[in-house]
């Protein structure tokens, strides 16, 4: 079918293409089968999903069980197609702009977030983004699974990607879309925050892997608005966090639950993003989350589960920063208490060690120097902060006087 640009858009976000799938595939849309399984459900902040399966027998203790491979498909080279559904999308919309920029940056050489999934099979040699498309047909009055499946199938057919195991169709519905409540419903259904059970999910219907990504700003804070950043800078935090969650899970488990899943985990959902959602708060944890810088901008993101690390990590290129304390002067035999501060983007705990401390002083693994200096002198102290795959040192002078 003919594709035409929707209109000018920010230079850093590719311009969408206008299509009308309902005009071209109306019969197929009405007859779409419902044979998929919803997975990777991102619940609203503070809520849990309903267990979809019994827990598998395991010798590990949750939430620290690793993902296991179920023998099914895995995307070796993910390709993302962003499908904006509805006539009300505009070039200036913050959600569509954020999504286009996010997907354009994922897979690029500066992306050390997607590469957490390398251990499960996906590989990245450039941007995963295949473009933004706008289906200008109005969504049904109430959108259900069969509608989303039909939309994904029609798009896949129009683009020649039906049956492509590496293809992801992300269906981003326009603001105000109402969703069926038989699966719990979207937390911002019909344009306002509510008691819905999900923020997004992904599935496979036998033809193509697709994501149901409603208009996240309709749900507000319960789907991540200002989750990481304050004010206007955090408006689309939930958009990038949740879109990234579903993207990583579709890459590692495109035909759920046959890919990489922790089958013992019935609390979070058990996929690579589920175990770390909202900082792991579903499990009562404090997993890594924060801003991730890609070639196309900086985005709020959650961490992903790493079997190699045995926990949630935010990046495969960890960086540690350590704050140099001012030079110290201590009176002989007086008690010392000095905290060394460091941070990391990896999501791992930072531990400390020190060399050449004044006699009688020692540093704990959390960076607290304590004790009583028992010898006069001048020392050049070096403190090193270490995390998984990275370390950083700083030095300062410490004098012990009478």
Q: For the regions a protein language model found, what residue spans apply to each?
A:
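Strand-loop-strand motifs at the edges of beta-sheets in extracellular beta-sandwich domains
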Residues: 359-374
């Amino acid at each position: 079918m003919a594709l035409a640009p929707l209109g000018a858009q920010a230079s850093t976000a590719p311009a969408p293409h206008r299509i009308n799938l309902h005009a071209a595939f109306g019969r197929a849309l009405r007859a779409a089968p419902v044979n998929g399984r919803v997975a990777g459900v991102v619940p609203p902040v503070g809520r849990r999903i309903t267990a979809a399966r019994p827990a598998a027998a395991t010798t590990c203790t949750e939430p620290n069980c690793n993902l296991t491979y179920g023998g099914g498909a895995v995307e070796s080279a993910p390709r993302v197609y962003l499908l904006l559904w509805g006539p009300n999308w505009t070039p200036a919309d913050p959600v569509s702009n954020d999504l286009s920029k996010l997907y354009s940056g994922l897979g690029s050489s500066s992306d050390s977030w997607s590469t957490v999934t390398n251990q499960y099979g996906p590989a990245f040699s450039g941007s995963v983004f295949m473009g933004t498309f706008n289906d200008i047909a109005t969504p049904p009055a109430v959108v259900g699974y069969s509608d989303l499946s039909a939309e994904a199938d029609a798009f896949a057919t129009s683009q020649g990607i039906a049956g492509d195991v590496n293809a992801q169709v992300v269906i981003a519905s326009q603001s105000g879309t109402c969703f069926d409540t038989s699966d719990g419903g979207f937390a911002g259904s019909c344009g306002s925050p509510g008691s819905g059970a999900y923020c997004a999910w992904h599935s496979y219907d036998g033809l193509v892997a697709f994501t149901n990504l409603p208009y996240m700003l309709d749900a507000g804070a319960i789907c991540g608005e200002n989750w990481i950043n304050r004010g206007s800078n955090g408006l689309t935090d939930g958009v990038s966090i949740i879109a990234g969650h579903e993207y990583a899970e579709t890459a590692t488990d495109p035909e759920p639950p046959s890919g990489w899943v922790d089958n013992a985990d019935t609390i979070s959902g058990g996929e690579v993003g589920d175990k770390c959602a909202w900082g792991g708060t579903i499990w009562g944890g404090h997993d890594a989350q924060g801003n991730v810088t890609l070639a196309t901008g900086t985005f709020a993101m959650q961490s992903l589960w790493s079997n190699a690390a045995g926990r949630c990590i935010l990046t495969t290129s960890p960086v540690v920063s350590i704050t140099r304390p001012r030079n110290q002067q201590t009176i002989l035999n007086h008690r010392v208490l000095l905290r060394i501060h460091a941070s990391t983007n990896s999501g791992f705990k930072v531990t400390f060690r020190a060399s050449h401390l004044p006699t009688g002083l020692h540093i704990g693994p959390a960076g607290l120097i304590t004790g009583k200096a028992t010898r006069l002198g001048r020392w050049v102290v070096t403190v090193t902060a270490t995390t998984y795959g990275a370390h950083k040192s700083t030095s300062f002078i410490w004098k012990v006087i009478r």
